[in-house]
Amino acid sequence: MKFNKMVSSDRGKNRKRHFNAPSHMRRKIMSSPMSKELRQKYNCRSMPIRKDDEVQVVRGHFKGQQVGKVVQVYRKKFVVHIERIQREKANGATVYVGIHPSKVLIVKLKMDKDRKRILDNKAKSRAKALAEKGKYTEETMETS
């Protein structure tokens, strides 16, 4: 069921908005889940990925245990390039293989003051949501 009349549920329109999204929106779209340890530490599930984060590929051909550093976040193509994930072209040159951010797990964050502030805000709002969760009891339901 649709709750907001102003938001379209048309598949074609949503795809158009996704693939024609400006760079500042692509940053948000290109978020990656965080490892269990980071989730516990920061009380936050996912973060927009950035250069110098350490990630682990969890899906696809390159999945495995080795951890690599993000070399480039290629917003135009919705992919990230990771340190040791390369392939050889026909002419012998090596190129990075693009991997979608949803298929990697952030293992270590590159921290700065802005990112710290974002994590604090996310943790605060999550704590507030947990505090409000289940606040309706039988008495409050009967009175309304």
From Swiss-Prot:
GO annotation, biological process: translation
CDD domains named in the record: KOW_RPL26 (cd06089)
Family matches, as SMART domains: KOW
Pfam families tied to this protein: KOW, Ribosomal_L26
InterPro entries: KOW, Rib_uL2_dom2, Ribosomal_uL24_CS, Ribosomal_uL24_euk/arc, Ribosomal_uL24_KOW, Translation_prot_SH3-like_sf
GO MF annotation: an example: RNA binding
One GO CC annotation: large ribosomal subunit
Biased composition (Basic residues): 13-22
Family to which this protein belongs: Belongs to the universal ribosomal protein uL24 family.
Name listed for the protein in its UniProt record: Large ribosomal subunit protein uL24
Species of the source: Littorina littorea (Common periwinkle)
Gene: RPL26
